Amino acid sequence: MASYYETTDFLGAPPASFREGLLGYGNPAVPALAGNHLVAAWSTDGRDAASVQDWGVFTSAGGLGAGVVRRTAGPLRVTGYHLSLSGGTGDAAVGVGYQGFSGDATALGRYNRLTVGTVARPSPYLSIGLAGNVALETDDREVVGEVGVRPLGDGRWTLFADAAWGEGEALTGVPWSAGTSVEVVDGVDLRTRVFDSEAVSIGIRVEFGRAGIDSQSRLDPTGDYAGQVNRVRAGDYEPSVLAETVREGKEHVELSLRGPVPYRDTRFGDLFGDAPPRFYELLRTVRQAGESDRVTALAVDLSDLEVRPELAWELRTAVQRAQARGVTVVAHLENGGMTAYHLASVADVVALDPQGSLTLPGYAASRTFVKGTLDKLGLGVQAWRFFEYKSAFERFSRTDYSRADSLQRRQYVDDQYELTTGDITAARPLGADSLDRIIDERLLLTAREARQAGLVDTLARWHEREGLLEAAAGAETADLGTDALDQIATAIRDWGAPAEVAVVYGLGATQVEGGMGSRKLSKTIRHLAEDDDVAAVVFRVDSPGGSPVAAAQVAEAIKACAAEKPVIVSQGQVAGSGGYWVSTHADTIVAGPNTVTGSIGVIGGWIYDEGFGDKTGLSSDVVQRGERADLLRGLRLPLLGVSIPTRKLTDEELGRVETIIQKGYDEFVAAVAAGRDTTEAHIRDVGAGRIYSGLDGTEVGLVDEIGGLPRAIQLARRATGLAADELTVREVNPTSGTVDFGQFLPGPLGVLADGLGEGGEARPGTQAHPTGTALRLILEHQPGPLVLLPPGAVPTAE
């Protein structure tokens, strides 16, 4: 069987120690670590540079490797091919492969063989490779070992050595090689390799980003020139000072925010078209654009944008950071409301479609009360409210706001208005009084009126963006796709897997199975606590609360995780009631200025049949043993799976429920006080169900800092004590469920079936129905207590 060195002479260094390593031809584990590439290699004989003695083509994608090699020895020709499969993590991989030969194979010692291999990179300083070759037609066996050392912990300087032991060979006669590689600048390195035979190879590699060239000259043991091996690579981006220098300041990035901005993808979400970019992906792209020397401008299409105000503020803040690094921003609108214009106003150039308009009415908190509807349906309501501001049941028991609820909503609306108008007037050439007059007197502005008022800079359509970018940036630029930008930003060839900041999402109502899914989520968080690869956790919460059981499960998991490593909570649009409970044990709570937070309180209520059966023709019967066994039985609504009890609670039963709710509140207060390291008396003072904006939350000690998800990640990085290049961010649960069946149910049934999904989004492109969420939770949990925000307290997406 031809030896390892005979079959891998295209390699400039051992396969697991240097770059793409022939993509599985030398060690089948390499493709799992190398990425996606296509390599063409050929060798020359002697000084005839135009001659081609041997050639090969190698490729890898998704851990799969394949290649074809043609070799010539005088009149003999042999063609070899290989297939390999590998998998692993950033610091270890295993692989298996098959090599077959045709032509004059046996004459040149080529026999079909099975190959197995592994690569371990336990640290940035060390790489170890081991491969075994087993001939399938003879008894030949071979073991290849290699080691690579990077004294500086990165690719600037690499030392390497390898050896191949064939079965029956004496260890003292094992062939070996050793050498070194020095990366002069990113993408340019010099390499030398010495063999036990005293032959030497000297090589140079030059990368141009997505392509590169490599050439090595071979000297025989006497020092005479023996030929040359050349390679050309195309594929994943490799760090390259040449590419960055050539493209510096000559590219722009385009972002389309049309439609919803979800936190997570749904499974098969892009089956019938492109899935919208996720919130974190948008934040990442804007950050990477700001950090890239290539990118000089950012174009953002906000037409048909559907995003909640808090998430828009976070995106706006990210854009501001990119601008601070010198990126020019152009924002485009076809039509816009308060939220979309708030986001657009930060841009250096705001363009509005010539036939478009702006609708700027200000902000209002409204609620539709359904007590009259329930009365007409024959559904009776018993509301149990023991805390002044805990108003979640008012929608079902009143026809207007209570004084306390009106007060807290007024304060929140004022904060939202002041933040938005303050940001707009700071970014645009108009004063606060002028903007107030536009909002109070104009409401709807045509495109030309918006331009005259100074709200937009120009009238143009999205297809004219290149001209807008050129005018704004002062030069023509090429479009750098978001995927390409991400590859460039993450193209780090260090060995080993960096420590992780894990971003985990807690979205939707606090429910054990639906919504946030506390059972599964708690398990995930506890696993992160035990995972040594995770250095810190960022818990993104967007939840109006719900079941106290579910909230407590997640809160205890966060507490356990925080005992092992830093945990930072990032509160999104809403983290109230049970959504606040799950946040309490984090080391730091970061909220946006308009996050709905707080609402520390417990509510309960009872909805029962008071003529509903007579009106609908439904009836029920019950056989019971136990004085109150009938309490939880009644009319079960078809399709929805919820029951309507047939009677209201007695005074004795109401007394028992009040005791349970008060005890539940005591436990809630105690949990928050312990998590926030404060007194229960203070939490009772700021509790009683009152909601706060993030800004007000900092004043009463419920929030530590104003910021978004990027700020939470930054704090998590800082808490680890590790350098930025020693950490990577990983989203733990970026995919949600598949289908929301509530969309197929008509009218009131759809309202009942609809659940609050990702941070208030039932499914991409639609709004969850808060009344349906609350009503369903009440019916499923009554007469038990709930830690739930009042429906409608969460601002809707525009």
Regions found by a protein language model. Name each.
Residues 1-63:
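N-terminal, post-signal peptide beta-strand-biased segments of exported outer-membrane/organellar beta-barrel
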Residues 5-8, 45-46, 54-238:
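Outer-membrane beta-barrel porins/channels
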Residues 226-431, 435-440, 444, 460, ...:
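Small-residue-centered hinge/linker elements
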Residues 433-453, 458, 677-706:
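Amphipathic alpha-helical substructures
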Residues 570:
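Substrate-recognition/specificity elements adjacent to catalytic centers across diverse enzyme folds
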Residues 720-730:
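Short, positively biased Gly/Pro-containing turn/loop motifs at secondary-structure boundaries
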